[in-house]
């Protein structure tokens, strides 16, 4: 019986039975100018409230732009000045999910949007991205 437990532990460790960190974002959005959209990022495989969550924009014509950050512990936010009044971040601890609402959309808002977990002084895990297309 003892060897069975040891072997199971070794196999479980080697095959990654332990939870893996994942950031799962909501699907693509195609919306008309002037409306708002709310996208989400669900964390799993770690203690959700131990890490702040950032949002980053990658438009077709520009490099990465930092939108802002939300504390998953208390909901405090900080935004890039450019996105104040445009982006609103919220957290739902019960579902380990952060949301970002973007208001008064224009074609300039079309982009790939990424959530990223902050660890120490770098982003250690990224969501797969949510494509936002604003078109009439």
Curated annotation (Swiss-Prot):
Domain of life of the organism encoding this protein: Eukaryota
Signal peptide: 1-19
Any one GO cellular component localisation term in the record: immunoglobulin complex
GO biological process terms held by the UniProt record: immunoglobulin mediated immune response
Gene3D superfamilies for the chain: Immunoglobulins
One of the record's GO molecular function terms: antigen binding
Keywords on record: Adaptive immunity, Immunity, Immunoglobulin, Signal
Classification via InterPro entries: Ig-like_dom (IPR007110), Ig-like_dom_sf (IPR036179), Ig-like_fold (IPR013783), Ig_sub (IPR003599), Ig_V-set (IPR013106), IgHV (IPR050199)
Protein name: Ig heavy chain V region BCL1
Species the sequence originates in: Mus musculus (Mouse)
Taxon lineage: Eukaryota, Metazoa, Chordata, Craniata, Vertebrata
